[in-house]
């Protein structure tokens, strides 16, 4: 059934009175108030003043590594503020949900006096290139009470403000990194300004506002290459990830030249983060042990947060201060005569590290890229061979902060460099690992999955990978809900609508010191109002395509503003309070039981191969030809484009 197109053009920026599915409008600055306009971060704090790290005087108390036995003191102190800040938006969210038989006001009053009772909420945004960024942006926008109409009928506005953590990897990491690199501006603001998220020009072409034509694209790449060269001239190793991260920054960070001096650790110095007015950002990457080319579930998972970088896995089981990643750590300390370094955690470099993927695609045949002169093809081929020999297809952190750290278990303990790759290469394409750690005590994770598992739609592979990882020693005893096979996801429709996993805590058998894992609210990318299964490697999108996919993500998050399920906001609220009610030994409200019967996977399995997966629109096709519909097998190799630009620009240095 197709709804009238007039029902699809209502925007979250404009008032409406009905719970209809929305379509994000074209760019219109006039609908955004002055107070909402994009605030450029004022903390480009790299000591070099640019992309290059720099040696600095160590503080009186030199930075050290710590074992991962608990949260850092900095995170604990921040949480003491943030958890209290989530009380009012959560109170409003639960009140609007109007759960029959549940006194939300009394519940929240009790939680205000006992924070351990307060639900601890996290949001995880999967990888998947621009598809993941745009689909994830739709979810984040729908959950943000700063945006009009998110708190009306069918809305879930305030869920973002009720959340403690916001994690991303690869394309989802671009979203998280972009939000925090722009003062945690709303999606509404980012769409309405012209400084970021202009995907019409691919990374290879460069930013439109620079006035660059096909002829002078090399000037853009020359600026990228010059900044990376400064890092190398300062004595630090560089890789293709440096170029990739620099190019990404032009699209994601609203500052001149993509903010080369902006660092990830400087998020901790921003006013809204210090006041804990935002969730806690986490980006994820995988470790690559010396000599490895295939990333398995046993790979060490690393996280970047504004305070620390490291791993909870028993292999490394330690964290280094993010601000001092480039320091000469050995066995957890900076030895006498060792140097402190700041600026290695450049924001684009961290986002690029979480999204390398180059070890899979750089050796592709670039001769198919239209318009590349033969001389450049020859030069690129030469560079690719050198990259393969030097293993520069990964993100390198040199010196390795975990040198001589946990020598018995750490695969990189005796290497001078720490090699990191795309956070989804171990198939855990949703950044769940940091959020399932018992010390973080997360109750519910809203897992937004934009993976390209089957015809560029997800089929639960990312969840299943995290579940299967719990059977190995690498999980360190961390539990995760049971996840069925891929065909069960498809045949039961678990990948075509929100699905809950781990609803009944009685299904978990706990050994000593184990804790019940979070409830997982799985929100898969599906065709609500757009064919949002665009290729991971599509390098550019029209404004209409971008907005349609973001609008589709909104409709996924809200079930079409309640069009598909008017009780969806109630079910979201039930997921939020579920673990808290279990801890308190209280009965599940009847309305929540109804929700759980509707959305919880009940253990049924149907593994029959039913052929090619081609889902139909769940609401209506909002401009089929304009939505970015993908032809299966289409692949635009943006990675080759990046390398071509890098080589060409380097020739001009």
From Swiss-Prot:
<feature type="glycosylation site" description="N-linked (GlcNAc...) asparagine">
    <location>
        <position position="459"/>
    </location>
</feature>
<keyword id="KW-0443">Lipid metabolism</keyword>
<dbReference type="GO" id="GO:0005576">
    <property type="term" value="C:extracellular region"/>
</dbReference>
<comment type="similarity">
    <text>Belongs to the lysophospholipase family.</text>
</comment>
<feature type="glycosylation site" description="N-linked (GlcNAc...) asparagine">
    <location>
        <position position="476"/>
    </location>
</feature>
<feature type="glycosylation site" description="N-linked (GlcNAc...) asparagine">
    <location>
        <position position="533"/>
    </location>
</feature>
<keyword id="KW-0378">Hydrolase</keyword>
<protein>
    <recommendedName>
        <fullName>Lysophospholipase</fullName>
        <ecNumber>3.1.1.5</ecNumber>
    </recommendedName>
</protein>
<dbReference type="GO" id="GO:0005783">
    <property type="term" value="C:endoplasmic reticulum"/>
</dbReference>
<keyword id="KW-0964">Secreted</keyword>
<dbReference type="GO" id="GO:0004623">
    <property type="term" value="F:phospholipase A2 activity"/>
</dbReference>
<feature type="glycosylation site" description="N-linked (GlcNAc...) asparagine">
    <location>
        <position position="98"/>
    </location>
</feature>
<feature type="glycosylation site" description="N-linked (GlcNAc...) asparagine">
    <location>
        <position position="149"/>
    </location>
</feature>
<feature type="glycosylation site" description="N-linked (GlcNAc...) asparagine">
    <location>
        <position position="507"/>
    </location>
</feature>
<dbReference type="Pfam" id="PF01735">
    <property type="entry name" value="PLA2_B"/>
</dbReference>
<keyword id="KW-0442">Lipid degradation</keyword>
<feature type="glycosylation site" description="N-linked (GlcNAc...) asparagine">
    <location>
        <position position="114"/>
    </location>
</feature>
<comment type="function">
    <text>Catalyzes the release of fatty acids from lysophospholipids.</text>
</comment>
<feature type="glycosylation site" description="N-linked (GlcNAc...) asparagine">
    <location>
        <position position="183"/>
    </location>
</feature>
<keyword id="KW-0325">Glycoprotein</keyword>
<feature type="glycosylation site" description="N-linked (GlcNAc...) asparagine">
    <location>
        <position position="561"/>
    </location>
</feature>
<feature type="glycosylation site" description="N-linked (GlcNAc...) asparagine">
    <location>
        <position position="365"/>
    </location>
</feature>
<feature type="signal peptide">
    <location>
        <begin position="1"/>
        <end position="19"/>
    </location>
</feature>
<dbReference type="GO" id="GO:0005829">
    <property type="term" value="C:cytosol"/>
</dbReference>
<feature type="glycosylation site" description="N-linked (GlcNAc...) asparagine">
    <location>
        <position position="298"/>
    </location>
</feature>
<feature type="glycosylation site" description="N-linked (GlcNAc...) asparagine">
    <location>
        <position position="328"/>
    </location>
</feature>
<feature type="domain" description="PLA2c">
    <location>
        <begin position="57"/>
        <end position="606"/>
    </location>
</feature>
<keyword id="KW-0732">Signal</keyword>
<feature type="glycosylation site" description="N-linked (GlcNAc...) asparagine">
    <location>
        <position position="602"/>
    </location>
</feature>
<feature type="glycosylation site" description="N-linked (GlcNAc...) asparagine">
    <location>
        <position position="407"/>
    </location>
</feature>
<dbReference type="GO" id="GO:0046475">
    <property type="term" value="P:glycerophospholipid catabolic process"/>
</dbReference>
<dbReference type="InterPro" id="IPR002642">
    <property type="entry name" value="LysoPLipase_cat_dom"/>
</dbReference>
<dbReference type="InterPro" id="IPR016035">
    <property type="entry name" value="Acyl_Trfase/lysoPLipase"/>
</dbReference>
<dbReference type="GO" id="GO:0004622">
    <property type="term" value="F:lysophospholipase activity"/>
</dbReference>
């Amino acid at each position: 059934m197709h709804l009238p197109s007039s029902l699809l053009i209502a925007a979250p920026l404009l008032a409406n009175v009905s719970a209809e599915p929305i379509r994000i409008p074209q760019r219109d600055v006039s609908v955004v108030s002055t107070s909402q306009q994009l605030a450029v971060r004022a903390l480009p704090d790299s000591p070099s003043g640019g992309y290059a790290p720099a040696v600095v005087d160590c503080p009186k108390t030199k930075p050290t590594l710590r074992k991962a036995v608990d949260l850092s003191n900095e995170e604990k102190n921040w949480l003491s503020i943030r958890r209290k800040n989530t009380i009012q938006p959560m109170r409003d969210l639960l009140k609007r949900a109007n759960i029959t038989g549940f006194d939300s006001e009394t519940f929240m009053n009790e939680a205000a006096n006992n924070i351990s009772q307060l639900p601890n909420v996290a949001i995880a945004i999967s990888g998947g290139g621009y598809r993941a960024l745009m689909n994830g942006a739709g979810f984040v926008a729908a959950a943000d009470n700063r945006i009009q109409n998110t708190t009306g009928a069918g809305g879930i506005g305030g869920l973002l403000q009720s959340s403690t953590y916001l994690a991303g990897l690869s394309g989802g990491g671009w979203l998280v990194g972009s939000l925090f690199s722009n003062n945690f501006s709303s999606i509404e603001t980012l769409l309405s300004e012209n400084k970021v998220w202009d995907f019409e020009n691919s990374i290879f072409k460069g930013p439109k506002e620079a006035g660059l034509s096909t002829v002078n694209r090399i000037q853009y790449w020359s600026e990228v290459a010059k900044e990376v060269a400064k890092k190398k001239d300062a004595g630090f190793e560089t890789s293709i990830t440096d170029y990739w991260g620099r190019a990404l920054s032009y699209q994601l960070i609203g500052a001149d030249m993509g903010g080369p001096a902006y660092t990830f650790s400087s998020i901790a110095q921003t006013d809204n983060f210090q006041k804990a007015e935002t969730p806690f950002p986490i980006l994820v990457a995988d470790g690559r042990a010396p000599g490895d080319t295939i990333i398995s579930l046993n790979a060490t998972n690393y996280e970047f947060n504004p305070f620390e970088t490291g791993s909870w896995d028993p292999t490394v089981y330690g964290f280094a201060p993010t601000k001092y990643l480039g320091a000469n750590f050995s066995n957890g300390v900076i030895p006498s005569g060792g140097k402190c370094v700041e600026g290695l955690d450049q924001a684009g470099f961290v986002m690029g590290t979480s999204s390398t993927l180059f070890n899979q695609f750089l050796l592709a045949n670039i001769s198919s890229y239209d318009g590349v002169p033969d001389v450049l093809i020859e030069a690129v081929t030469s560079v690719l061979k050198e990259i393969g020999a030097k293993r520069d297809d990964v993100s390198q952190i040199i010196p390795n902060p975990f040198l001589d750290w946990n020598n018995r278990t750490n695969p990189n303990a005796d290497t001078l460099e720490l090699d990191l790759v795309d956070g989804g290469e171990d198939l855990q394409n949703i950044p769940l690992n940091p959020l399932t750690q018992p010390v973080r005590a997360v109750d519910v994770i809203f897992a937004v999955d934009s993976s390209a598992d089957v015809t560029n739609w997800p089929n639960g592979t990312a969840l299943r990978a995290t579940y299967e990882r719990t059977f190995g020693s690498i999980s360190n005893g961390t539990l995760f809900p049971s996840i069925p096979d891929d065909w069960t996801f498809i045949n039961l429709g678990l990948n075509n609508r929100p699905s809950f996993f781990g609803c009944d805590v009685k299904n978990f058998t706990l050994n000593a010191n184990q804790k019940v894992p979070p409830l997982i609210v799985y929100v898969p990318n599906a065709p609500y109002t757009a064919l949002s299964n665009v290729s991971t490697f599509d390098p550019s999108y029209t404004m209409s395509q971008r907005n349609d996919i973001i609008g589709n993500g909104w409709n996924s998050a809200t079930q079409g503003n309640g069009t598909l399920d008017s009780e969806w906001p109630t079910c979201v609220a039930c997921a939020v309070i579920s673990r808290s009610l279990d801890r308190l030994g209280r009965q599940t409200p009847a309305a929540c039981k109804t929700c759980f019967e509707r959305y919880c996977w009940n253990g049924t399995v149907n593994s029959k191969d039913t052929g090619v997966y081609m889902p139909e629109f769940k609401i209506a096709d909002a401009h089929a030809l304009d939505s970015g519909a993908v032809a299966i097998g289409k692949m635009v190799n943006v990675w080759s484009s990046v390398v071509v630009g890098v080589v060409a620009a380097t020739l001009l240095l």
